[in-house]
């Protein structure tokens, strides 16, 4: 019986548990023996394995996070640690490793594949910054978390004629901010592609306030407080000092913790099935993603050289009020 191991790596994302469950379901149907690695590459190096018989995923399918744990293990860049990780797998007769994570996790998998291990990567990150997939596992649910939270903030913002500045996750990718702005009818959004200094920010807000008595702005994380721009706390203070009451909200890890929604689960099921089919057909290491609502696969080199999606039109659309 062929064997596979599954691990989750990097930041957690809604749908990781469902991905593990779908992979297990399709693998067992193909007579594969399934192992789980606890806590990502850290567990792979430290030999922390459990079998699918030791963990009932039924109760975790709809839960956010990852029941087998995840971690960021920078020491894995050490070649000797990677060799030990491969040895741990080989001792169990495991030749196929499925990695659920983002670009950093993919780099670890590519390094393992160069040691003769078959690695299959699925895009697990809320940031939607994996170029080999139109949408990543966790993105749609994080977007729903943004919609729910912003809707609640809208009510109090409108009631008190205020400005609300809402910081959104996404690391260096603006997709959650742009898609979130469109999904919530935000007044405008600020991303790395259109960052505003204090004067520019105030000008945009006052333009919105010319036709309504409130303003809701989504801002990507990792923009303010660096590269010569003020912190968001300073932005808030600036507006307060200029007679515009301002609420500053960071949505933080609420964007990671929701139960995966329907479109998330649908796409996960397609990618999981495609992954197991590749394993059964003895494919070499591959990166799996979504394109036009279908699961697709690429070799590592092709995947790493795919271009980023251009969001210029969407950014202009959401910022119609201030252009």
Curated annotation (Swiss-Prot):
Keyword Transferase: yes
Keyword list, A-Z: ATP-binding, Cytoplasm, Glycolysis, Kinase, Magnesium, Metal-binding, Nucleotide-binding, Transferase
Any one of the GO CC terms: cytoplasm
Active site: 127 (proton acceptor)
Pathway: Carbohydrate degradation; glycolysis; D-glyceraldehyde 3-phosphate and glycerone phosphate from D-glucose: step 3/4
Pfam families: PFK (PF00365)
Residues holding substrate: 125-127, 162, 169-171, 221, 253-256
GO molecular function terms listed in the Swiss-Prot or TrEMBL record: 6-phosphofructokinase activity; ATP binding; metal ion binding
Required cofactor names: Mg(2+)
Presence of the UniProt keyword Kinase in the record: yes
EC number(s) from the headed UniProt entry: 2.7.1.11
Catalytically driven reaction(s): beta-D-fructose 6-phosphate + ATP = beta-D-fructose 1,6-bisphosphate + ADP + H(+)
Job of this protein: Catalyzes the phosphorylation of D-fructose 6-phosphate to fructose 1,6-bisphosphate by ATP, the first committing step of glycolysis.
Family from the record: Belongs to the phosphofructokinase type A (PFKA) family.
NCBIfam families (UniProt xref): PRK03202.1
Protein's name according to its UniProt entry: Probable ATP-dependent 6-phosphofructokinase
Native species: Mycoplasma genitalium (strain ATCC 33530 / DSM 19775 / NCTC 10195 / G37) (Mycoplasmoides genitalium)
Lineage, broadest ranks: Bacteria, Bacillati, Mycoplasmatota, Mycoplasmoidales, Mycoplasmoidaceae
């Amino acid at each position: 019986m062929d064997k596979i191991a599954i691990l989750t790596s990097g930041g957690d994302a809604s749908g990781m548990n469902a991905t593990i469950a779908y992979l297990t379901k399709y693998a067992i149907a193909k007579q594969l023996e399934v192992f789980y690695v606890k806590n990502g590459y850290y567990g792979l190096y430290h030999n922390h394995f459990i079998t699918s018989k030791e963990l009932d995923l039924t109760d975790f399918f709809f839960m956010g996070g990852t029941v087998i744990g995840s971690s960021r293990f920078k020491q894995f860049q050490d070649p000797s640690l990677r060799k030990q990780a491969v040895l741990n797998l080989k001792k169990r007769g495991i030749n196929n490793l499925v990695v659920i994570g983002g670009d950093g996790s993919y780099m670890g998998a590519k390094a393992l594949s160069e040691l003769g291990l078959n690695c299959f990567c699925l895009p697990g990150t809320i940031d939607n910054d994996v170029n080999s997939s139109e949408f990543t596992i966790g993105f749609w649910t994080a977007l729903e978390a943004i919609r729910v939270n912003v809707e609640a903030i809208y009510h109090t913002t409108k009631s008190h004629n205020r400005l609300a500045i809402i910081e959104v996750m996404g690391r260096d990718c603006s997709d959650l901010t742009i898609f979130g702005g469109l999904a919530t009818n935000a007044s405008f959004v600020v991303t790395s592609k259109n960052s505003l200094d204090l004067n520019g920010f105030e000008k945009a807000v006052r333009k919105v306030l010319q036709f309504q008595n409130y303003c809701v702005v989504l801002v990507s994380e990792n923009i303010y407080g660096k590269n010569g721009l003020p912190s968001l706390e300073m932005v808030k203070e600036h507006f307060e000092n200029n007679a515009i009451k301002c609420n500053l909200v960071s949505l933080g890890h609420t964007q990671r913790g929701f139960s995966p929604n329907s479109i998330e689960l649908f796409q996960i099921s397609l990618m999981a099935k495609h992954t197991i089919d590749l394993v059964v057909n003895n494919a070499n290491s591959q990166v799996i993603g979504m394109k036009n609502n279908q699961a697709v696969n690429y070799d590592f080199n092709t995947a790493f050289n795919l271009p980023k999606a251009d969001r210029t039109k969407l950014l202009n659309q959401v910022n119609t009020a201030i252009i």
